[in-house]
Amino acid sequence: MGSSVRKKKEKKKDFQKTKLKVGKAKEKPASFTDTSFKSRAIVVAQSSLTVEGPNPVEQFKHYLSLASTSRSENQRRDALAFLTTQLSHQPPNNPVGTPAILAKLLPLISDSNSGVRTQLYKLLQAFPSADIQPQVERISMYVRAGMTHLSADIRDDTLSIMEWLLEVAGSEVVSCAGGWMKTLNVFAAMLGWSSIVAANAAAAAGSAPRNKGWTSAPKSTFGAAKGGASYARQLLALAKFLEIGFRPEATGSGGQRTLWNSLYRLPRTSNPFGYLNLFGAPRDEDSEIYADREDRQRVFSRKWHAVITKGLEEAKKEGGAVGRAGAVLNQTLKDGLADYDDHVL
């Protein structure tokens, strides 16, 4: 009986207000902990406090690995943004080299996420032109694959990369292995001119052309706003590509100095004798290097001139932006092939 009364009093005491007396300190609770002491050091288990930050080289490699292998779209995009920031510094922070970066990131040209593709485009623009020019052949392979992708958005984004590549390394694009013929094949497929190519090939072989199905019909935008804009961009990109390919080579002033330079000066390109294909596999016509303007004019006139001329006739019928782009392409053809007959004769 006594214990129950004592417990009731203790419970009741918790709800009673303590009367404070003047000059007497407030009673401390039973769980009070004295924190008035001062410590000279704080020891945290399994942790270290250091002034030095993460290793910049390892951090760069970590984000490069995230950008190329992460399954998360947000992680890939954010990693590309970090790499773009590092490459945009003055001087650029590129500890692994441009070839290593491109080898890991070029497959992202056909990434399914538009944010990743946009960020990759910004990263490519951060590279100096001198770093891009020796890597044009590798870049062109992925760009050609993206330009013939099933997704229209991926084709449009890849076309932006092609436009940028023509700006920074146009002469290398048209003169690398497969850069002339394979790129023309891709433009023909993108513009819907594959049926014209097949018909011309059948006519040259002397066989009757096959009936065209709905999959091989010439491309038409039917007045669609987005489709018309994309079609016009493709025509203008093709015009830019042909303008660079038909551009006359710069000629020196001649003289004794030019002769000595041609004999003893070190080449500026990474593979100056690549057009000879001394140690590579045999190339077909599409994979060949067309290093000078005359070779490009010759093969274009034989295989592509009639195809593009017929495709332009269909493009001009649409008018608007497509018609104007077709006029630019038509003028490029006239200027580029104006002196071709003179060279042949």
Swiss-Prot record:
Annotated segments matching region Disordered: 1-29
Biological-process GO terms, alphabetical: rRNA processing
Stated family: Belongs to the IPI1/TEX10 family.
InterPro entries for this protein: ARM-like, ARM-type_fold, Ipi1_N
Subunit structure: Component of the RIX1 complex, composed of IPI1, RIX1/IPI2 and IPI3 in a 1:2:2 stoichiometry. The complex interacts (via RIX1) with MDN1 (via its hexameric AAA ATPase ring) and the pre-60S ribosome particles.
Name of the protein: Pre-rRNA-processing protein IPI1
Disulfide bonds: none
Superkingdom: Eukaryota
Pfam family, one: Ipi1_N
